Amino acid sequence: MGIVCKGFDGVLTEYDWAQMSGLMGNMPSVKGPDDFRVGTTIQGSTVLCEVLPGQAWAHGVMCTSNSVETVTGQLPGPGETRYDYVVLSRDWEQNTAKLEIVPGGRAERARDVLRAEPGVYHQQLLATLVLSSNGLQQQLDR
């Protein structure tokens, strides 16, 4: 089914509001410790991140996933180390959300790489991946 979001333009039911109100207060947040948890494996030069189902909240939009979602990226070139970010991106113009891996740089600088424009486009950090051409060096969860 993918990711369904409430809080963009459209109908919001009492049930939706009850679910959302329990997540308010911490920005951004997830409902439980395993919600949107990221598991990472490497196959050749491909980075595979499986994101568990759950609920996530940020800036008035609650996203619910009821199945494991997979996003992919690539390892950096030989001799390089790179910080990449697994994020839940919300797009208010398209009224959509998606999971993606955002390539970073040689140092942990999520605030300089991720978009944070609530009401326009926002990327909620789920995990930081420290990658080298040899594979996953470290994963830092939210």
Please tell me what each predicted stretch does:
Residues M1-I42:
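N-terminal alpha-helical "arm" segments
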Residues I3-Y15, L48-R142:
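Beta-strand-rich solenoidal segments
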Residues N26-M27, D34-F36, T41-G44, C49, ...:
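Intrinsically disordered, low-complexity segments enriched in polar/charged residues with Gly/Pro
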